[in-house]
Amino acid sequence: MARYKKRPTIQPGMPGLFDDFDDSLFTSADDFPVHPAIEKEAERRLAAEKEKRERMLFDDGDTFSPLEALPTIDRLKFISFGSGSSGNCAYFGDDTSGFLIDAGVDMVHVVDELHRNGIDMKTVKGIALTHDHSDHVRYVYAFLRKYRHMQVFCTPRALNGLLRRHAISNRIKDYHHAIYKEHPFTIGNFTLLAFEVMHDGTDNAGYYITNGAHHIVVATDLGCISERADFYMRKANYLMIEANYNAPMLAAGTYPEYLKARISSDNGHLDNEVTAEYLARIYTPALRNIFLCHLSKDNNTPDIALNAVEDALRQAGVTEIGDCSESPYARMAPVQLMALPRFDSTGLITLRLK
């Protein structure tokens, strides 16, 4: 049954909708006298409402404010579990989320180290792969099978290379999150962007990573520093860069000539002097931590790599260089430098902007 609204009754002599009328004939509500007690109560309520609004905007307590700024994350967490041809894996995280770069180190060792440093695997959201060589992917499927909440982030070409090169179940595709170079994606609280690096793997990638004001760059396994790699590495506050070999040691070593040529090619690995000269050229006070990674077991030593980089930085005017320790003296240095161990964990390293 249709419902109808009753038409209002129009009284004779009252103005119509479009008629002009003298509003001075009507008395406003503001013109009526107000009892002093009512007026006082209204003033009290207005004052209380004003105080409540100010408390919402400026109070540091638990009161919610729609204009309250998000908390600033002033430090990040970093652990390297191993870096070199025997296996590569590293962790970046904040207080609530994190991820792994590569999965070439035994899963049990990685998980034990994370737990020892108070990091729950539930907060480790995924694995970002740099390329498909075995020292970077050997344990990736083991992680995914045990921790079903995790995903593997790599380009489709890198995933195809991984399946082609290694005896890994096709079910890894169920955990694959496809990424594309120069297109940002997120893992937890981090934004990552993969960029092209020169190496002889399949669709090799470096990573430019941000979390608030923190800028991280990972550039491992690259034979030369391309324009895109240079573009992103200059943005870094924390830089993981390869220093694979000492050129005289490689030349005098026992490797066959074809392998020496492969290592020293533009699609191979970086030697200490190239890395050192490059770091001296791009250094600014914004660069807080330098991690030398993927040192060769046969053609390099940590001391040789560190000395090459330290000498280049000092020639560029950097007089104080810390060692990534928590000692007050080391923390006062404008830049921290460390050669990542080949087989061991670094322990938890705190990354600070100040």
What positions do the PLM features span?
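Cap/insert and terminal regions of metallo-dependent hydrolase folds
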Residues: 3, 227-339
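C-terminal regulatory/interaction regions
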Residues: 2-55, 60, 303-354
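Metallo-beta-lactamase
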Residues: 50, 56-62, 156-206, 210-213
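Active-site metal-binding motif and surrounding structural segment of the metallo-beta-lactamase
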Residues: 107-154
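Metal-dependent catalytic neighborhoods of phosphoester/phosphodiester hydrolases
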Residues: 138-148, 164-166, 300-307
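Conserved beta-strand hairpin/beta-sheet module of binuclear metal-dependent hydrolase folds
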Residues: 4-6, 11, 18, 23-41, ...
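Active-site neighborhood of phospho(di)ester-bond hydrolases with catalytic His/Asp-centered motifs
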Residues: 100-104, 124-133, 153-156, 217-221, ...
